[in-house]
A protein has these predicted regions:
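Flexible, polar/low-complexity N-terminal or interdomain linker segments that lie immediately upstream
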Residues: 1-47, 122-139
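Catalytic cysteine-centered active loop of the rhodanese-like fold, especially the PTP/DSP P-loop
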Residues: 65-113
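Short, flexible helix/strand-to-coil boundary loops that buttress conserved ligand/catalytic motifs
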Residues: 28, 49, 65, 117
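Short, hinge-like loop/turn segments at secondary-structure boundaries
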Residues: 54, 72, 119-124
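Glycine-rich, highly charged phosphate/nucleotide-binding loops
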Residues: 56-65
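Short loop/helix-cap segments at secondary-structure boundaries that form the rim of catalytic
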Residues: 45-51, 113
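Conserved beta-strand scaffold positions in the cores of enzyme catalytic domains, especially
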Residues: 36, 53-55, 103-105
Length: 139
């Protein structure tokens, strides 16, 4: 059975379940920062990640979720590579299916986090690239 939904309701609901890199950076500085989960492969994790993120590949997420995130109501942000990757959607669905109530997908993923000039960590150290003018707000 199809239920009608207004455009307003659709977009309001959508914003409840997604965040972007800039908003995630601001949320991480708040009093209740989200747990950030990287669901990419080991190789991708080694290449670069959001500082402070926890690495739980999608294939392991259902099994490890309760040890990584014991509070079902805590804020969680899930990311993968970028806009062409649906790993964060699958990860967020896994968590929601397990009963987590405050899960958001990071739209743009790691790619847009880095392109916005936010700090990244890799196995070789910490870095920050100049913001890409096509993705980062001009000051």
């Amino acid at each position: 059975m199809q239920t009608a939904i207004t455009a307003r309701d659709f977009f309001a609901a959508k914003l409840q379940f997604e965040t972007d890199p800039s908003d995630l950076a601001a949320d991480r500085a708040s009093a209740t920062p989200p747990l950030v989960i990287d669901v990419r492969s080991d190789a991708a994790w080694s290449q670069g990640r959001i500082p402070g993120a926890v690495h739980v590949p999608n294939a392991e997420l259902a099994e490890r979720a309760s040890s990584v995130a014991p509070d079902l109501n805590a804020p969680i942000a899930v990311y993968c590579w970028g806009p062409g990757c649906n790993g964060s959607t699958r990860g967020a669905l896994t968590l929601a299916s397990l009963g987590y109530t405050n899960v958001k997908e990071v739209i743009g993923g790691f790619e847009y986090w880095a392109r916005e000039g936010l700090a990244v960590v890799s196995d070789t150290g910490r870095s920050r690239q100049a913001p890409d003018p096509l993705t980062a707000p001009v000051a």
